[in-house]
């Protein structure tokens, strides 16, 4: 049996650093990375988003999941106030859409040449942004955002069935694997607390 690759995830500070760097680069990069994290998407899923998948009036996005052919309708995050502006999907998407040029393909995220952003291009731009933001190379891939989202949801008490739906897992078994990661985070936090106390 093949050994499973170690799951990598970003801390809250690392996610913030990546989003700040993405925002500094472009509205497209900020929107694509934020949506990837918020909805626990794979690179191919975010690159496959079309303008018709967005319902800005009702603040929703339809996501076609790659594995299991699931379709989920999810709310777009809207946060009032500057302290949460990096996570305000509605505001970030409006900014991006205002400057986006139409290519006729209908894809939401476009390359600098105006065609659909490919998975390879998205992975490359995420890696560049993550490395510039100080993220370790082994964490500098878009799938770490999906791992991070699952881990953060579970660590904050969201039940497994809700996490499964939010990130588009077909099987609850795919979601359960994140419990161990959350336990690992808790153990590390306990060690840090003990080090400060003793």
PLM features: what roles do these ranges have?
Residues 1-9, 194-198:
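C-terminal secondary-structure termini that scaffold catalytic or DNA-interacting sites
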Residues 2, 12-43, 101-103:
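Basic, Lys/Arg- and aromatic-enriched nucleic-acid-binding interface segment
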Residues 21, 57-60, 66-112:
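Basic, alpha-helical nucleic-acid-contacting "clamp/cap" segments
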Residues 22-25, 124-165:
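Short, basic (Lys/Arg/His-rich) helix/loop patches that form interaction surfaces
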Residues 35-36, 152-153, 166, 178:
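Short alpha-helical segment immediately N-terminal to, or the first helix within
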Residues 36-58:
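Short, charged phosphate-coordinating catalytic segments
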Residues 53-56, 139, 158-179:
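Short, polar N-cap/turn motifs at the start of nucleic acid-interacting alpha helices
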Residues 65-68, 167, 172-192:
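Catalytic-site neighborhood detector that most strongly recognizes the C-terminal catalytic loop/helix
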């Amino acid at each position: 049996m093949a050994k499973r690759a170690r799951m990598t995830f970003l801390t809250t500070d690392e996610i913030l650093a990546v989003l700040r760097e993405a925002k500094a680069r472009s509205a497209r990069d900020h929107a694509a990375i934020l949506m990837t994290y918020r909805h626990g998407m794979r690179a191919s899923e975010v690159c496959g988003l079309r303008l018709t998948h967005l319902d800005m009036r009702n603040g929703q996005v339809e996501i076609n999941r790659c594995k299991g052919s699931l379709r989920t309708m999810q709310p777009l995050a809207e946060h009032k106030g500057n302290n949460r502006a990096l996570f305000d999907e509605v505001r970030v998407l409006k900014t991006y859409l205002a400057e986006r040029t139409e290519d006729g393909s209908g894809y939401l995220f476009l390359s600098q040449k105006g065609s659909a952003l490919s998975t390879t291009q998205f992975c490359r731009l995420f890696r560049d942004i993550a490395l510039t933001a100080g993220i370790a190379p082994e964490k500098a891939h878009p799938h770490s955002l999906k791992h991070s989202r699952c881990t953060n949801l579970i660590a904050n008490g969201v039940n497994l069935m809700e996490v499964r739906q939010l990130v588009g897992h077909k099987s609850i078994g795919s979601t359960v694997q994140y419990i161990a990661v959350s336990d690992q985070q808790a153990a590390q936090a306990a060690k840090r607390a003990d080090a400060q106390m003793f």
